[in-house]
Design a protein with these regions (language model features):
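Short, Lys/Arg-rich flexible segments
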Residues: 1-152
Length: 152
């Protein structure tokens, strides 16, 4: 038999179990997004971009590396961060770029060089590698559903 007090004591555990599970769920969701955005470099298209592949280079003979993969730094810089209060941000971490940029010493990355508002280049986003992904959103929903199922 279970007493009323035993039942109340059992429910005291649930909030901490939920908080712990939510933290782990956010980590999993962040890892899923990072994995999907890094995969866009192999697929040569942004996730969920209606099947549109990145445009080819205008001069293929000039470069001897994969499209969007001169050093691999941009792909390797994709990361995520948890914020207090429930937030999760996916971003490119400029600290993961090599010390000297190959285009211009003031910028460590090709993306930063082309998207700098003070530079001579206008913003020029030609090959999107991060964005909404219905597949990852579905995975995130499943992760949260499993979390709720585990505490009920």
């Amino acid at each position: 038999d279970i007493t009323f007090q035993d039942m109340l004591n059992q429910w005291k555990i649930v909030p901490s179990k939920f908080a712990s599970g939510l933290f782990k769920a956010k980590l999993k969701i962040g890892e899923e997004y990072v994995k999907e955005f890094k995969r866009s470099f192999d697929l040569k298209k942004a996730p969920g971009d209606n099947g549109r592949f990145w445009p080819l280079r205008k001069n293929e003979h000039r470069y001897h590396h994969e499209l969007m993969n001169e050093t691999g730094d941009l792909k390797d810089s994709i990361s995520y961060q948890l914020y207090e209060g429930g937030g999760l941000m996916i971003y490119t971490d400029e600290n993961k770029f090599r010390a000297n940029g190959r285009r211009n010493d003031a910028f460590k990355s090709y993306a930063a060089f082309h998207n700098d508002p003070t530079g001579t280049w206008p913003p020029n986003i030609q090959r999107k590698f991060m964005g909404d992904s219905p597949l990852v959103e579905l995975k995130a929903q499943l992760i949260l559903y499993n979390l709720l199922k585990s505490i009920i």
